[in-house]
Curated annotation (Swiss-Prot):
G5 motif: region residues: 243
Organism name: Mus musculus (Mouse)
PTM sites of type N-acetylmethionine: 1
SMART domains: EH
Region named G3 motif: 153-156
The protein's name in its UniProt record: EH domain-containing protein 3
Stretches assigned to the Dynamin-type G domain: 55-286
A GO term for molecular function: lipid binding
GN (gene name): Ehd3
GO BP, sorted A to Z: cilium assembly; early endosome to Golgi transport; endocytic recycling; Golgi to lysosome transport; positive regulation of voltage-gated calcium channel activity; protein homooligomerization; protein localization to plasma membrane; protein transport
Annotated region (G2 motif), positions in chain: 91-92
Length: 535
């Protein structure tokens, strides 16, 4: 009789089936989250509605910093070529937002044309008006790096009130719009003249909901000596600790990101290691792009739910006829109490609420009579999406990761550090002697042989027990020594001959010098007598 009730129930329990993560995100947003956003005017308070291009676009990297910290030079270093509209100098040069993207031919697309292109994820930027669009361009060029990622260059942040007023648009709001949609935010600081102006502090605070995307680069570190670099690094961490309100330590990369010779090469190895870490982080973006979009949708859904509770609470408190203006002022002033009540009634985390001061400012300009009462059905749909459909998409994300080839950023500066003698760590640690004709272990073998013959070899081999007595003198943990034993015991007979023993000691030396052990023994470390056997 009431079969339609059962059908509705079943529909609720069974999550939707999607072909790809991107299609799933689009469908969930349009059918389940967007109706809630529109009903409670979410877009007027927080963020414009998402479009298909927001789900389809490549990973984006946003560069933010004060003027002359090396933002544009950093992009030039990554791409290993100039891009249209690029200007570099010690004075404030970049006066526009430049989206550096892949294109078949080099050229510049002006802002007004860019925001009407449905294939680009910038259509909603038209809300910032002509003052901004005249300062926004897209630089297109064919480049291998840009096949995997896009980079957003921003105007340098200046000190003083004039730069804030004379821009003609809300600079912090534009940055926040980009921060919501990019995969990585890189804050650049100049090690040679470390300074965090009030404007820069405000910008960092505006990005506070996106700390998980933030990385810090202390650039131009080759201009100062080691002792000064330590002081500058300490000062930077102290300053950031006051601005970024997070208990976790933000990751700071130290280096000199340009293609000129290092001015002070004392810390060359440090810079190389830091550059590799940063490059690995950027290279992982295409692989994690779907997960990032999923994470951002969840974050947006949680904010939309809280916003719905706030708006419906304000509607409920408003009188129907008299004293509306007085009540409106009272409600805005007591918004903190409303936050507290919603938090208790609906068990919502305080971190999910929008900024109190900003919300109060926005509410002053709103007509409360146009607000809508609580509509439980809309909220239930979003709750159902978070509980069931998102879990389904998480499974799909993992499936796509395993089925597709590993996606990495290639070309430009990423290419020069992967292989060959200038690859990171080439010829060091277990890689030492990779290009030598002679077996690298042979250099120290006479010393190892002296120890070997004191360990009572039988038929030219020592037992595992005797080898252990000598190997534990290194004070390395048993787990590490066990791995060294597996690598050195090439014929797997549970004993070591003189060459295998020398190899084990060589690997111990590699580990004690701070290098990682290989998972498999490299060909150049194979003892000469064992090479024919392995072949």
């Amino acid at each position: 009789m009431f079969s339609w009730l059962g059908n509705d129930d079943r529909r609720k329990k069974d999550p939707e089936v999607f072909q790809t993560v991107s299609d799933g995100l689009k469908k969930l947003y349009k059918t389940k989250l967007l109706p809630l956003e529109e009903y409670y005017r979410f877009h007027e308070f927080h963020s414009p509605a998402l479009e298909d291009a927001d789900f389809d676009n490549k990973p984006m990297v946003l560069l933010v910093g004060q003027y002359s910290t090396g933002k544009t030079t950093f992009i030039r270093y990554l791409l290993e070529q100039d891009f249209p509209g690029m200007r570099i100098g010690p004075e404030p040069t970049t006066d526009s937002f430049i989206a550096v993207m892949q294109g078949d031919v080099e050229g510049i697309i002006p802002g007004n044309a860019l925001v009407v292109d449905p294939k680009k994820p910038f259509r909603k930027l038209n809300a910032f008006g002509n003052a901004f669009l005249n300062r926004f361009v897209c630089a297109q060029l064919p480049n291998a790096v840009l096949e995997s990622i896009s980079v957003i260059d921003t105007p340098g942040i200046l000190s003083g009130e004039k730069q804030r007023i004379s821009r003609g648009y809300d600079f912090a709001a534009v940055l926040e719009w980009f921060a919501e949609r990019v995969d990585r935010i890189i804050l650049l600081f100049d090690a040679h003249k470390l300074d965090i102006s009030d404007e820069f502090s405000e910008v960092i605070k505006a990005l506070k909901n996106h700390e998980d995307k933030m990385r810090v680069v202390l650039n131009k570190a080759d201009q100062i000596e080691t002792q000064q670099l330590m002081r500058v690094y300490g000062a930077l961490m102290w300053s950031l600790g006051k601005i970024v309100n997070t208990p976790e330590v933000i990751r700071v990369y130290i280096g000199s990101f340009w293609s000129h010779p290092l001015l002070i090469p004392d810390n060359r190895k440090l810079f190389e290691a830091e550059e590799q870490d940063l490059f690995r982080d950027i290279q992982s973006l295409p692989r994690n792009a779907a997960l990032r979009k999923l994470n951002d949708l969840i974050k947006r859904a949680r904010l939309a739910k809280v916003h719905a509770y706030i708006i419906s609470s304000l509607k409920k408190e408003m009188p129907s006829v008299f004293g509306k203006d007085t009540k409106k002022k009272e409600l805005v002033n007591n918004l903190a109490e409303i936050y507290g009540r919603i938090e208790r009634e609906h068990q919502i985390s305080p971190g999910d609420f929008p900024n109190l001061k900003r919300m109060q400012d926005q509410l002053q300009a709103q007509d409360f009579s146009k607000f809508q009462p609580l509509k439980s059905k809309l909220l239930e749909v979003v709750d159902d999406m978070l509980a069931h459909d998102i879990a389904q998409l998480m499974v799909l994300v993992r499936q796509e990761e395993t089925q597709r080839p590993v996606q990495m950023v290639k070309g430009g500066a990423f290419e020069g550090t992967l292989q060959g003698p200038f690859g990171h760590g080439y010829g060091e640690g277990a890689g030492e002697g990779i290009d030598d004709a002679e077996w690298v272990v042979a250099r120290d073998k006479p010393m190892y042989d002296e120890i070997f013959y004191t360990l009572s070899p039988v038929d030219g081999k020592i037992t595992g027990a005797n080898a252990k007595k000598e190997m534990v003198r290194s004070k390395l943990p048993n787990s590490v020594l066990g791995k060294i034993w597996k690598l050195a015991d090439i014929d797997k007979d549970g004993m070591l001959d003189d060459e295998e023993f020398a190899l084990a000691n060589h690997l111990i030396k590699v580990k004690l010098e701070g290098h990682e052990l290989p998972s498999e023994l490299p060909a150049h470390l194979l003892p000469p007598s064992k090479r024919k056997v392995s072949e």
